């Protein structure tokens, strides 16, 4: 079974990436971009906005598709994750929903923190990370 998911790649004015620490499986304890499963009938854009608001307290404007990855899940599930660039339009970062923590991360953090599998490689391959 394929499960459609979305994620948001959000940078601040200092080129730091917004990451959340997953509070529940899959990926509990790992840092990732905000995102999750689409609700039935929900568009990608609406899903990105909802997930970011639920997990971080931030309102966003959704930009272009950065890339897509397939991730295996339990019981033969495949998570099809479409990650979009987004910009903050309102709110103050605060962990919520299934996020245990939320923070702006620089390049050093991306190397040091335990990230979701393939996150750094995907962001690099898609060319969305700011220069060192």
Which residues fall in each region the model found?
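Conserved hydrophobic "DFG−1" position in protein kinase catalytic cores
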Residues: 10-11, 19, 86-88, 104
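A short coil-to-beta-strand element that immediately follows conserved catalytic motifs
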Residues: 59-67
